[in-house]
């Protein structure tokens, strides 16, 4: 079944059937104030911290038909008739679930718009968080599309969460005793609803207000639903009364409902209402907080400002290729998702629920996320990298995650196991790749000299030591160099990128070995550019040493092993019953360069990726490993808690798929690289969504593989490193436009069937208009480049500081 379609001209995905397999969401605002809105109007919002400053109550585990966080009701009747005779509908369809004539939910660039027709009315609702503000604005335009006058009340409703999101679910005594929701009469005659937990009354109050006076209001869920809450969200019994109670709630399950009398709307007439949900500093500041977003002009200006931001953001990379789904994702939806993962890390989504103050921002997650936004928002990327570097330990390792408000860091799940190491071996290395990408993109080499403290502090909370960004990077690789095991390979620690494989202390990681190799290569390249011969020699030596160890110890005959356990036995070997072959063991041996052994193609690199194609590749994506473990094994850890074919246990874990795509481009196989891309492109799944279920406009984290009965089912969309890496694989390796220290490298690897493509790329103050022709049906290899009318040698375009420059290239 088709649930919607892409409208690239408007930068929207248009949902036309509200009965999607799961909730499809869109993000609004930022971590400072924002969250997500689902396609039927529900919202999950917070200010600053979803764990400790939650605003709306949204429980994803409840059925899709349930009200979640926010909605609105329209009470429609003939003029002069009673409320009991009215038809009650929702512009969002949920929770009323009544008959509708048409439904559109337009998922845009950090806004969502609904255009629905029902009960003789056309609703046009726009929801977004204005840039720089701390309010969710919803503008309702209600048009009488019938041929008779209709009397209409609009009743927007918000259900509040306790600020402590976890306690909202786990403490049914303390939470309701602390909650208050009260009507506040404003000087201009409007009514605002102020809701708060008692202990936050003087510094964190949630407010719901409209731009017109309310006829009545409600603050208590029990009264609103009616009949001791045996009334339902589908048809609250209080809406059968002429007015709501206008009583305050001094405990219980608090809501805000405003009865807004739109009067009698004539045929063809439109009435507008603007509502806002915000958080202000205390009950005394409610009046002052309700002065904005009163007029259509204000909303229009704020919406234009939001769209202008996305105009700028999306203008940095614009592509046109023979593949429409590739164009749609790369020009619109993939960049938006990269922005979202950079903003939210893995903090708050339909699946990452944001409970518990120890989750916060992941070190490895956000290091990779920055790489997907450096081109568009380099200053914000740098700011995040500085925060990440500040939670690096003096020994070069990194804390696994941190709270962005308090900057308190933790070691993650490793602290739950007394007998396992309390660090993740890959964490600290990712920042080397991120900083290197930032330097190549911006040329901001002064960043290397910025002093940033390490995490450890004295009793007065002062840093024990600080170092330059360069010193932080050097310590990251030095930590790996100094922590190796029986085979001379990096110790696994509690885990590497694959959090769920938790082998006993002493295990070694081939993933970390290869990531270390890539990090060393980046540092060596940087040293060469800066003329630092001594450090270049050091890093080159470490690289050669690790490359030798990997090839001497980890080649299994047809592929590379993935781990060595604490006893020195291989994991990811043909000799194993389960987990014989692991994707990351192969792709990363190519990415690091370790698999080449002096060759640019073929050899172990080609053999390893051939094993991936033979054993791991499915038509819906590449599996993380094969075959899946069939039973819990405490020596392996969390990977064996999943059934075969799910998540890390032989599932199609999407994050590593772009690493395989990059590996294939490095081997020169553009057809295979793009084939792998297409298999996981959600836009290409639009016509098979009943199987896939997740949003077709963003990447999921995982898809159940062919080892699972529900092969093809996707989950955990939006907040996934898949987004950043697919974006990099697409722009830097398939299209082949890579910023380097000395210039802009043009090195495409595309399907042979493509006759060419164009890219407009903004970098370091200049615009490059790149046109690539492919007359001979090649995948890789530049035969000729002409820059501003002059042919250049090689494929490295020199940097320009300004202006627009034409680049004409021919493959062959």
Predicted regions and their residues:
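Short Pro-Gly-centered flexible turn/kink motifs
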Residues: 31, 150, 263-281, 516-519
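Polysaccharide-binding surfaces and accessory modules of carbohydrate-active proteins
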Residues: 63, 112-114, 125-239, 289-316
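Extended, loop-rich substrate-binding clefts of extracytoplasmic carbohydrate-active enzymes
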Residues: 80-135, 231-258, 331-335, 339
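Beta-strand-rich N-terminal accessory domains
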Residues: 1-68, 190, 203, 278, ...
């Amino acid at each position: 079944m088709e649930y919607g379609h892409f409208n690239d001209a408007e930068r929207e995905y248009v949902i036309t059937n509200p009965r999607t397999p799961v909730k499809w969401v869109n993000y609004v605002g930022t971590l400072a104030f924002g969250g997500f809105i689902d396609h039927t109007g529900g919202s999950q919002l917070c200010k600053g911290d979803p764990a400790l400053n939650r605003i709306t109550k949204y429980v994803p585990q409840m059925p899709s038909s349930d009200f979640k966080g926010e909605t609105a009701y329209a009470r429609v009747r003939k003029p002069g008739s009673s409320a009991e005779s009215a038809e009650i509908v929702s512009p969002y369809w949920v929770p009323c679930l009544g008959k509708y004539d048409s439904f559109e939910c337009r998922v845009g660039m950090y806004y969502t718009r609904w255009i629905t027709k029902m009960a003789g009315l056309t609703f046009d609702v726009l929801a977004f968080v204005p840039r720089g503000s701390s309010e969710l604005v919803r503008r309702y335009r209600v048009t009488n599309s019938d041929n008779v006058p209709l009397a209409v009340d609009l009743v927007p409703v918000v259900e509040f969460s306790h600020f402590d999101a976890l306690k909202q679910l786990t403490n049914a005594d303390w939470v309701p005793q602390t909650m208050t929701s009260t009507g506040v009469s404003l000087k201009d005659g409007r009514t605002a609803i102020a809701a708060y937990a008692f202990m936050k009354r003087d510094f964190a109050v949630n407010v719901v207000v409209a731009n017109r006076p309310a006829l009545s209001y409600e603050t208590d869920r029990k009264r609103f639903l009616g009949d001791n809450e045996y009334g339902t969200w589908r048809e609250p019994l209080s809406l059968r009364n002429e007015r709501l109670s206008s009583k305050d709630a001094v405990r219980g399950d608090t809501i805000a409902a405003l009865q807004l009398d739109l009067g009698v709307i004539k045929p063809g007439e439109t009435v507008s209402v603007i509502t806002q949900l915000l958080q202000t500093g205390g009950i005394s500041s409610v009046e002052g907080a309700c002065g904005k977003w009163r007029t259509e002009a204000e909303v229009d200006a704020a919406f234009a400002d939001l769209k202008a931001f996305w105009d700028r953001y999306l203008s940095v990379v614009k592509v046109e290729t023979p593949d429409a789904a590739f164009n749609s994702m790369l020009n619109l939806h993939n960049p938006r998702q990269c922005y979202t993962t950079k903003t939210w890390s893995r903090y708050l989504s339909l699946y990452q629920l944001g409970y518990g103050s120890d989750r916060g921002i992941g070190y490895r997650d956000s290091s990779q996320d920055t790489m997907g936004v450096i081109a568009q928002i380099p200053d914000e990327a740098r700011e995040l990298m500085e925060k990440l570097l500040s939670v690096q330990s003096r020994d070069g390792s990194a804390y696994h995650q941190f709270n962005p408000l308090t900057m308190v860091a933790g070691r993650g799940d490793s602290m739950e196991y007394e007998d396992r190491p309390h660090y993740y071996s890959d964490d600290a290395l990712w920042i080397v790749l991120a900083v290197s990408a930032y330097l190549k993109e911006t040329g901001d080499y002064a960043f290397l000299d910025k002093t940033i403290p390490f995490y450890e502090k004295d009793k007065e909370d002062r840093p024990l030591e600080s170092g330059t960004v360069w010193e932080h990077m050097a310590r990251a690789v030095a930590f790996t160099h100094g922590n190796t095991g029986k085979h001379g390979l990096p110790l696994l620690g509690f885990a590497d990128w694959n959090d769920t494989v938790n082998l006993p202390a002493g295990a070694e990681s081939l993933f970390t070995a290869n990531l270390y190799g890539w990090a060393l290569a980046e540092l060596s390249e940087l040293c060469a550019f800066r003329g630092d011969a001594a450090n270049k020699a050091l890093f080159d030596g470490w690289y050669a040493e690790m490359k030798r160890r990997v090839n001497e110890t980890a080649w299994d005959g047809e592929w590379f092993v993935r781990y060595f356990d604490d006893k020195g036995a291989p994991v990811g070997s043909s000799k194993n019953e389960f987990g014989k072959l692991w994707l990351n063991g192969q792709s990363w041996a190519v990415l690091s360069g370790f698999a080449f052994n002096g060759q640019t193609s073929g050899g172990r690199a080609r053999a390893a990726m051939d094993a991936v194609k033979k054993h791991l590749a499915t038509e819906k994506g590449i599996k993380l490993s094969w075959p899946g473990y069939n039973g819990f094994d405490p020596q392996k850890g969390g990977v064996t808690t999943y059934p075969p074919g799910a998540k890390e246990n032989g599932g199609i874990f999407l994050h590593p798929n772009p690493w395989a795509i990059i590996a294939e481009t490095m081997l020169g196989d553009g057809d295979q690289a793009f084939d792998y891309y297409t298999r996981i492109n959600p836009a290409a799944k639009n016509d098979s969504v009943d199987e896939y279920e997740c949003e077709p406009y963003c990447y999921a984290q995982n898809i159940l593989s062919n080892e699972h009965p529900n092969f093809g089912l996707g989950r955990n969309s939006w907040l996934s490193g898949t987004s950043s890496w697919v974006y990099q694989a697409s722009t830097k390796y398939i299209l082949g436009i890579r910023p380097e220290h000395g210039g802009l490298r043009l090195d495409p690897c595309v399907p042979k069937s493509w006759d060419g493509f164009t890219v407009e790329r903004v970098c370091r103050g200049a615009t490059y208009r790149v046109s690539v022709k492919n007359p001979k049906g090649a995948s890789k290899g530049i035969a000729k480049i002409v820059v501003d009318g002059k042919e250049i040698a090689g494929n490295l375009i020199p940097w320009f500081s300004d202006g627009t420059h034409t680049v004409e290239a021919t493959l062959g």
